Amino acid sequence: MRERETEVAIVGAGAAGLSLALRLAHPPPGARPLAVTLVEAPAGPLRPPPRTWCWWEPAGGPFDGWLTASWSRLRVRGPDGDTIERGLGGCRYKMLTSADFEARVRERTGAVERREWTVRRVRSRAGGAELLGETAEGQPARLRARWVLDSRPPAAPPPARTRLLQHFHGWFLRTPRPAFDPTVVELMDFRVPQPAEGLAFGYVLPLAEDRALVEYTGFSRRPLDDAGYRRALAHYAGRVLGLGDDHRVEAVERGVIPLTDARHPRRAGPAVFRIGAAGGATRPSTGYTFAAVQRQTAAVADALFAGRAPLPPPAYPARALALDAVLLAALDRGRVRGADVFPRLFREVPIARLLRFLDGRTSPAEDLTVGRRAPALPLLRTVVDLAVRPRRAAPPAAARPAPVPR
């Protein structure tokens, strides 16, 4: 058995694991460098596929030089085609591919030891914790660490009252003539058939006048099958966007993100902590994760360099999560139509306030001003319903989708 020791073990090389490794590779002035080992799964089903991450923040962010694209305007369309377009002021909507992020992080983390192991177990031990698993060649392996930061999905989903999936399937399209406005993101286009419960919308990230990532996204209890996604995307790209059959699919992106009101434990043992989606970084009402991962890993790195236990802070305030729980339950039970709620919010709420709200950074007074734009009676009924509904474990037969941070 291969046995090693380190101060900090990071399990998983997705957005959270890579972000934390990058921060720990560059100690602040006066801080002692830490021995860090990043353990990622060997190539195969346990390693996440290439994917795209999006978020909004002011221009001049730390990853701006790594971006595939960014935009200063967003557009939302209602089911009837009513269009709301908003400038983002000093913010940009940013797109970064996981392949580019990993390549840039690898260039900047030479001091971080990397291991391709399948981790089967993380257990506490005196003075820290240890990872047990096997190498890519199938040899037993053990790594002892003072601290473990684990970004893998838990073995079983935590108890919840509502369980939806944000599932999406996208085509990277090229057209023979200009077909897209590269200055505006089509954030939510509800001109697609809507399910009885949940919602569905189109999503377009224009990379040039003749290139774009075009996605079909649904919020529902179950994803579609491959044929269903092909039909939905063919309808959206061909008929709604007016591209017909005159386009070429150059690549495909797909993913499933659990959206629940579960409470995600951020501590799994005296020296073991969860980060990323496993630590609650996914916003339940939107599926966005990357920006919260950056806040979370920054706090973890600060704690480690200061010699403190690296307990990740809550990714979102309790008040924001309570509001999300109500919205998810109302969507799941068909009490509100997302195709009506989201366009109204973008139409009636100032964009700067709405973006703060979606980030969980608004005050209680601002939350009230946003909430007044939502259908009050269905949401109040849902509040009463949730007050008496306990969180329950997921059914044993329920598939556990691997989170793909968006």
Regions found by a protein language model. Name each.
Residues 2-38:
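N-terminal Rossmann-like FAD-binding beta1-loop-alpha1 element of flavoenzymes
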Residues 9-11, 39, 142-155, 272-277:
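Short hydrophobic core segments
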Residues 23, 27, 108-247, 260-264:
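Predominantly flavin-linked oxidoreductase catalytic cores and closely associated redox partners
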Residues 23-81, 100, 169:
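N-terminal FAD cofactor-binding segment of flavoenzymes
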Residues 55-128, 134:
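A conserved beta-strand/loop capping segment in the N-terminal third of enzymes
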Residues 193-199, 255-274, 327-350:
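FAD-binding beta-loop-beta segment adjacent to the flavin cofactor pocket
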Residues 222-253, 270-273, 294-316:
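Flavin-binding catalytic cores
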Residues 298-406:
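C-terminal helical "tail/cap" subdomain of flavin- and related membrane-associated enzymes
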